[in-house]
Amino acid sequence: MGNKVNPIGMRLQVNRTWDSRWYADTKDYGDLLLEDLKIREFIKEECKQAGISRVIIERPHKKCRVTIHTARPGVIIGKKGADIEGLRRKIAAMTDSELHLNIVEVRKPELDAALVGESIAQQLERRVSFRRAMKRAVQNAVRMGAQGIRVNLAGRLGGAEIARTEWYREGRVPLHTLRADIDFANVEATTAYGIIGIKVWIFKGEIMEHDPQARDRRHAELQEGGGPRPQGGGRPRRDR
Protein backbone atom coordinates (compact mmCIF):
# COMPACT_ATOMS: atom_id res chain seq x y z
CA MET A 1 0.00 0.00 0.00
CA GLY A 2 2.93 2.32 -0.66
CA ASN A 3 0.79 4.53 -2.87
CA LYS A 4 -1.76 5.10 -0.10
CA VAL A 5 0.47 6.66 2.56
CA ASN A 6 2.20 10.03 2.66
CA PRO A 7 5.80 9.34 1.56
CA ILE A 8 7.15 11.99 3.93
CA GLY A 9 5.41 10.64 7.04
CA MET A 10 6.45 7.12 6.12
CA ARG A 11 10.15 8.10 6.14
CA LEU A 12 10.24 10.21 9.31
CA GLN A 13 13.09 9.12 11.60
CA VAL A 14 14.44 6.93 8.77
CA ASN A 15 16.14 9.49 6.55
CA ARG A 16 14.25 12.73 7.15
CA THR A 17 12.96 14.71 10.09
CA TRP A 18 10.01 16.92 11.05
CA ASP A 19 9.43 20.51 9.95
CA SER A 20 8.55 21.41 13.57
CA ARG A 21 11.45 20.52 15.86
CA TRP A 22 10.79 21.15 19.52
CA TYR A 23 9.68 19.53 22.76
CA ALA A 24 7.03 20.86 25.16
CA ASP A 25 5.20 19.79 28.29
CA THR A 26 1.68 18.44 27.93
CA LYS A 27 0.07 21.69 29.10
CA ASP A 28 1.93 23.78 26.50
CA TYR A 29 1.98 21.35 23.58
CA GLY A 30 -1.42 22.25 22.10
CA ASP A 31 -0.79 26.01 22.24
CA LEU A 32 2.62 25.70 20.56
CA LEU A 33 1.25 23.38 17.86
CA LEU A 34 -1.56 25.84 17.08
CA GLU A 35 1.01 28.65 17.04
CA ASP A 36 3.09 26.71 14.48
CA LEU A 37 0.05 26.25 12.24
CA LYS A 38 -0.83 29.96 12.42
CA ILE A 39 2.75 31.01 11.62
CA ARG A 40 2.92 28.69 8.60
CA GLU A 41 -0.46 29.79 7.24
CA PHE A 42 0.44 33.45 7.73
CA ILE A 43 3.80 33.14 5.95
CA LYS A 44 2.31 31.28 2.98
CA GLU A 45 -0.49 33.83 2.67
CA GLU A 46 1.76 36.87 3.18
CA CYS A 47 4.46 35.64 0.76
CA LYS A 48 2.33 34.08 -1.97
CA GLN A 49 4.59 35.26 -4.79
CA ALA A 50 7.83 34.19 -3.10
CA GLY A 51 7.58 30.46 -3.90
CA ILE A 52 7.54 29.07 -0.35
CA SER A 53 8.78 25.48 -0.20
CA ARG A 54 9.05 24.71 3.52
CA VAL A 55 8.75 26.56 6.82
CA ILE A 56 10.86 24.96 9.55
CA ILE A 57 10.16 25.98 13.15
CA GLU A 58 12.59 25.20 15.96
CA ARG A 59 12.12 26.19 19.59
CA PRO A 60 15.30 26.22 21.67
CA HIS A 61 14.98 27.59 25.22
CA LYS A 62 12.50 30.53 25.18
CA LYS A 63 13.25 31.21 21.52
CA CYS A 64 11.49 30.59 18.21
CA ARG A 65 13.66 30.06 15.14
CA VAL A 66 11.72 30.20 11.85
CA THR A 67 13.51 29.16 8.65
CA ILE A 68 11.76 29.91 5.36
CA HIS A 69 12.87 27.95 2.28
CA THR A 70 11.94 30.01 -0.77
CA ALA A 71 12.71 30.10 -4.48
CA ARG A 72 12.63 33.93 -4.56
CA PRO A 73 14.26 35.31 -1.40
CA GLY A 74 14.38 38.82 -2.87
CA VAL A 75 10.58 39.01 -2.76
CA ILE A 76 10.60 38.33 1.00
CA ILE A 77 13.60 40.51 1.85
CA GLY A 78 12.48 43.51 -0.20
CA LYS A 79 14.42 46.67 -0.95
CA LYS A 80 17.14 47.17 1.68
CA GLY A 81 15.47 44.54 3.88
CA ALA A 82 12.32 46.59 4.47
CA ASP A 83 9.86 43.78 3.73
CA ILE A 84 11.57 41.17 5.90
CA GLU A 85 11.59 43.53 8.88
CA GLY A 86 7.85 44.03 8.50
CA LEU A 87 7.37 40.27 8.25
CA ARG A 88 9.54 39.75 11.33
CA ARG A 89 7.43 42.17 13.39
CA LYS A 90 4.17 40.51 12.35
CA ILE A 91 5.43 37.00 13.18
CA ALA A 92 6.91 38.20 16.48
CA ALA A 93 3.45 39.47 17.46
CA MET A 94 2.12 35.90 17.06
CA THR A 95 4.51 34.32 19.56
CA ASP A 96 5.68 35.08 23.11
CA SER A 97 9.17 33.71 22.39
CA GLU A 98 12.18 35.61 21.07
CA LEU A 99 11.97 35.33 17.27
CA HIS A 100 14.84 34.54 14.89
CA LEU A 101 13.91 34.62 11.20
CA ASN A 102 16.14 32.99 8.56
CA ILE A 103 15.73 32.87 4.77
CA VAL A 104 17.14 29.95 2.75
CA GLU A 105 17.15 30.04 -1.05
CA VAL A 106 15.95 27.00 -3.00
CA ARG A 107 18.39 27.04 -5.90
CA LYS A 108 16.63 24.34 -7.95
CA PRO A 109 12.86 24.83 -7.67
CA GLU A 110 12.37 22.24 -10.45
CA LEU A 111 13.42 19.56 -7.93
CA ASP A 112 11.13 20.72 -5.12
CA ALA A 113 7.74 19.00 -5.08
CA ALA A 114 5.92 21.88 -3.35
CA LEU A 115 7.23 24.44 -5.84
CA VAL A 116 6.49 22.19 -8.82
CA GLY A 117 2.93 21.73 -7.55
CA GLU A 118 2.49 25.49 -7.04
CA SER A 119 3.79 26.16 -10.55
CA ILE A 120 1.29 23.72 -12.06
CA ALA A 121 -1.53 25.22 -9.97
CA GLN A 122 -0.72 28.74 -11.17
CA GLN A 123 -0.69 27.58 -14.79
CA LEU A 124 -4.06 25.84 -14.41
CA GLU A 125 -5.53 28.99 -12.85
CA ARG A 126 -4.28 30.93 -15.89
CA ARG A 127 -6.13 28.43 -18.12
CA VAL A 128 -3.00 26.77 -19.49
CA SER A 129 -3.64 23.27 -20.86
CA PHE A 130 -3.26 20.77 -18.01
CA ARG A 131 -1.36 18.32 -20.22
CA ARG A 132 1.11 21.02 -21.23
CA ALA A 133 1.60 22.03 -17.58
CA MET A 134 2.19 18.42 -16.50
CA LYS A 135 4.64 17.65 -19.32
CA ARG A 136 6.56 20.87 -18.76
CA ALA A 137 6.98 20.12 -15.04
CA VAL A 138 8.15 16.56 -15.76
CA GLN A 139 10.62 17.68 -18.44
CA ASN A 140 12.10 20.42 -16.23
CA ALA A 141 12.61 18.05 -13.29
CA VAL A 142 14.31 15.44 -15.48
CA ARG A 143 16.49 18.11 -17.08
CA MET A 144 17.66 19.27 -13.63
CA GLY A 145 18.68 15.75 -12.60
CA ALA A 146 15.68 14.07 -10.94
CA GLN A 147 15.84 10.27 -11.18
CA GLY A 148 12.07 10.07 -11.36
CA ILE A 149 8.95 12.22 -11.11
CA ARG A 150 5.23 11.55 -11.07
CA VAL A 151 2.51 14.21 -11.38
CA ASN A 152 -1.13 13.41 -10.61
CA LEU A 153 -4.06 15.72 -11.43
CA ALA A 154 -7.65 15.07 -10.34
CA GLY A 155 -10.81 17.06 -10.95
CA ARG A 156 -12.74 18.61 -13.84
CA LEU A 157 -9.72 18.70 -16.13
CA GLY A 158 -10.17 21.02 -19.09
CA GLY A 159 -13.65 21.94 -17.85
CA ALA A 160 -15.01 18.42 -18.44
CA GLU A 161 -18.44 17.60 -17.02
CA ILE A 162 -17.15 14.44 -15.33
CA ALA A 163 -14.15 14.63 -13.02
CA ARG A 164 -11.27 12.28 -13.76
CA THR A 165 -7.64 11.62 -12.88
CA GLU A 166 -4.62 11.85 -15.17
CA TRP A 167 -0.96 11.32 -14.35
CA TYR A 168 2.44 11.30 -16.01
CA ARG A 169 5.58 9.59 -14.83
CA GLU A 170 9.18 9.78 -15.99
CA GLY A 171 11.89 7.51 -14.57
CA ARG A 172 11.50 5.60 -11.28
CA VAL A 173 9.43 6.57 -8.24
CA PRO A 174 9.90 3.67 -5.74
CA LEU A 175 7.35 4.48 -3.01
CA HIS A 176 7.95 1.20 -1.14
CA THR A 177 11.71 1.72 -0.76
CA LEU A 178 12.31 3.48 2.56
CA ARG A 179 15.85 4.52 1.65
CA ALA A 180 14.52 6.34 -1.44
CA ASP A 181 14.69 10.13 -1.15
CA ILE A 182 11.19 11.08 -2.30
CA ASP A 183 9.82 14.59 -2.04
CA PHE A 184 6.02 14.84 -1.99
CA ALA A 185 3.52 17.70 -2.12
CA ASN A 186 -0.24 18.04 -2.36
CA VAL A 187 -1.51 21.32 -3.83
CA GLU A 188 -4.92 22.62 -4.90
CA ALA A 189 -5.68 24.83 -7.90
CA THR A 190 -8.86 26.93 -7.79
CA THR A 191 -10.26 27.16 -11.31
CA ALA A 192 -13.55 28.40 -12.77
CA TYR A 193 -14.75 24.78 -12.93
CA GLY A 194 -13.84 23.91 -9.35
CA ILE A 195 -10.89 22.61 -7.34
CA ILE A 196 -8.22 20.53 -9.08
CA GLY A 197 -6.01 18.43 -6.82
CA ILE A 198 -2.32 18.20 -7.70
CA LYS A 199 0.07 15.62 -6.27
CA VAL A 200 3.78 15.57 -7.06
CA TRP A 201 6.35 12.88 -6.23
CA ILE A 202 10.04 13.50 -7.05
CA PHE A 203 12.66 10.75 -6.62
CA LYS A 204 16.15 12.18 -6.10
CA GLY A 205 18.12 8.99 -5.43
CA GLU A 206 18.71 6.71 -2.45
CA ILE A 207 19.99 7.59 1.03
CA MET A 208 21.95 4.67 2.47
CA GLU A 209 22.57 6.09 5.97
CA HIS A 210 19.91 5.67 8.67
CA ASP A 211 19.87 9.25 9.97
CA PRO A 212 16.89 11.66 10.22
CA GLN A 213 19.17 14.54 9.19
CA ALA A 214 20.57 12.68 6.16
CA ARG A 215 17.93 13.96 3.76
CA ASP A 216 18.50 17.62 4.67
CA ARG A 217 22.26 17.25 4.18
CA ARG A 218 21.79 15.52 0.83
CA HIS A 219 19.23 18.12 -0.24
CA ALA A 220 21.72 20.94 0.48
CA GLU A 221 24.38 19.16 -1.59
CA LEU A 222 21.88 18.62 -4.43
CA GLN A 223 21.01 22.32 -4.45
CA GLU A 224 24.69 23.19 -4.83
CA GLY A 225 25.62 20.63 -7.50
CA GLY A 226 23.93 18.61 -10.22
CA GLY A 227 22.17 15.32 -9.67
CA PRO A 228 22.52 12.07 -11.60
CA ARG A 229 20.78 11.73 -14.93
CA PRO A 230 17.60 9.60 -14.85
CA GLN A 231 17.15 6.33 -16.65
CA GLY A 232 14.06 4.84 -18.27
CA GLY A 233 11.23 6.35 -20.26
CA GLY A 234 7.99 8.04 -19.38
CA ARG A 235 4.56 6.47 -19.39
CA PRO A 236 1.49 8.67 -19.71
CA ARG A 237 -1.71 7.26 -18.29
CA ARG A 238 -5.27 8.39 -17.75
CA ASP A 239 -7.69 6.97 -15.18
CA ARG A 240 -11.39 7.56 -15.54
UniProtKB/Swiss-Prot annotation:
Regions of compositional bias (Gly residues) in chain numbering: 224-234
Pfam families tied to this protein: KH_2 (PF07650), Ribosomal_S3_C (PF00189)
Superkingdom classification of source: Bacteria
Keywords annotated in UniProt: Ribonucleoprotein, Ribosomal protein, RNA-binding, rRNA-binding
GO cellular component, as recorded: cytosolic small ribosomal subunit
Swiss-Prot/TrEMBL GO biological process terms: translation
Family annotation (PROSITE patterns): KH_TYPE_2 (PS50823), RIBOSOMAL_S3 (PS00548)
Gene Ontology molecular function terms on file: mRNA binding; rRNA binding; structural constituent of ribosome
Chain segments carrying region Disordered: 212-240
InterPro entries, per database record: KH_dom, KH_dom-like_a/b, KH_dom_type_2, KH_sf_prok-type, Ribosomal_S3_C_sf, Ribosomal_uS3_bac-typ, Ribosomal_uS3_C, Ribosomal_uS3_CS
Compositional bias (Basic and acidic residues): 212-222
Ranges of residues in domain KH type-2: 39-107
Subunit (UniProt): Part of the 30S ribosomal subunit. Forms a tight complex with proteins S10 and S14.
UniProt record similarity statement: Belongs to the universal ribosomal protein uS3 family.
Function: Binds the lower part of the 30S subunit head. Binds mRNA in the 70S ribosome, positioning it for translation.
Protein name per Swiss-Prot or TrEMBL: Small ribosomal subunit protein uS3
Species annotation: Dinoroseobacter shibae (strain DSM 16493 / NCIMB 14021 / DFL 12)
GN (gene name): rpsC
